[in-house]
Amino acid sequence: RDTFMDNAWWGTAPDADIVLVALDQATCTHADITNAIEYIFDYATEVGKPCVVNLSLGNHDGPHDGTSSFDRMADTMQGPGRIIVGAAGNHRKDAFHLSRTFTTAGDDPLRTFIAFKQQPTKDSYGGEVQIWAEQGMDIEVTLSAYSVFNKKDMTTVTIYPAEGQQTVKLGSYATGTMTVASEVNPTNGKLNILIT
C-alpha cells in the first residue's frame, strides 16, 4: 500500500507473486525464453494462481505480423489464466522501423539512412537490416555510400536480387563487407531479405 500523503490506493495486484527468471543476454535464444515462460507458468499451476508473463525483450526481428515461430509459440502457451504481454519498448525516439506502401512499379523509391554501430568490439560492431515484402512483390534493394561533405551518393550497388557476400567500394579509401541473404518465408509467404 502506498502511504505517501495518506494515499488510500493499493497496488494493482497486492497479493501477486513475482517470479523472476534470469537469462544470459549475450547467448539467450527464443528457446531459452520459451523455457523461462514455461517455468513461470508451471510455478503458477503449482500454486494455483493465474499468471501474466511480461516480456520486455527489446527485440526488433521478424515480420511483426504474428507469424514468427516465437509469436506462434507464445500463442499456443496462452489460455485461461495464462497471458503473455510484450512491452512496447524504450525506442520511441529511435528510427528502428520504416514502412511504405507501393501501389505501382513507378512509385518513387523508399530511401533512408542506416547508421551501423562503429565501436570495434564483438558486442557492438556492425548491425543488420531486415526487409519484409508482401507476397509477389518484385523489389530491388540498392546500397549507396553517401558523402556528408558533397551531399550526394558517391557510389551505388544493387544488393538484391543477389545472394552471398559482396565487397562494396564505399569511397576512394574505404571498403566494407556485407552479406545479403533472402528467402520466401514458409509461414507467411512474404519475401524476407537480411543484410548484415
Tell me the role of every PLM-derived stretch.
Residues 2-4, 39, 76, 179:
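Residue-level detector of functional hotspots within protein domains
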Residues 1-31, 48-49, 79-83, 96, ...:
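Subtilisin-like serine protease catalytic core
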Residues 1-3, 42-43, 145-149:
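Short regulatory "switch" loops immediately downstream of catalytic or recognition motifs
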